[in-house]
């Protein structure tokens, strides 16, 4: 997870919750400001309890969290779900806690929880100031490099 400047790494042990409004309302999530991670565990219930023991050291701070209204959502009822991400290694800065919401879950891929697809990308992109992305190399480039090296080795052996 990166800080607000987009370059400073502020943690390596992130915990993320994909929550619908019937699990925990956005307003209730904001009410957890200043409370420990145990308060989130209690609010979410045993089904969403932490597995990382370091999470208990983290104090929730929502001062810099992305508010629903800044995402272009009219009010705290005009959304379907939201994503709660925070650092679990004991960092207590408010920049270690992020909240973002989405209006539409029509494209959510429920069969693969590792790839959450937001219904409207604009809601997530408006929180881009706090996130940083890293370009991943194309897998075929490595394969082509290996094939080229193998071909070169064969030519040398034949010569």
Residue ranges and their predicted role:
Residues 138-155:
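A short, hydrophobic C-terminal helix/tail in secreted or cell-surface proteins
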């Amino acid at each position: 997870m990166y800080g607000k400047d987009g370059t400073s790494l502020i943690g390596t042990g992130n915990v993320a919750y994909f929550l619908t409004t019937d699990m925990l309302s956005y307003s209730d999530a904001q009410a957890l400001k200043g409370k420990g991670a145990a308060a989130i565990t209690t609010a979410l219930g045993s089904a969403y309890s932490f597995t990382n023991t370091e999470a208990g050291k983290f104090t929730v701070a929502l001062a810099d969290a992305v508010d629903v209204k800044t995402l272009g959502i009219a009010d705290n009822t005009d959304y379907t779900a939201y994503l709660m991400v925070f650092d679990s290694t004991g960092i207590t800065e408010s920049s270690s806690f992020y909240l973002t919401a989405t209006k539409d879950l029509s494209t959510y891929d429920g069969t693969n929880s590792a790839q959450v697809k937001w219904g409207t990308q604009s809601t997530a992109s408006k929180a881009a100031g706090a996130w940083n992305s890293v370009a991943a190399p194309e897998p075929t480039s490595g394969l082509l490099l290996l094939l080229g090296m193998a071909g070169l080795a064969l030519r040398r052996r034949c010569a």
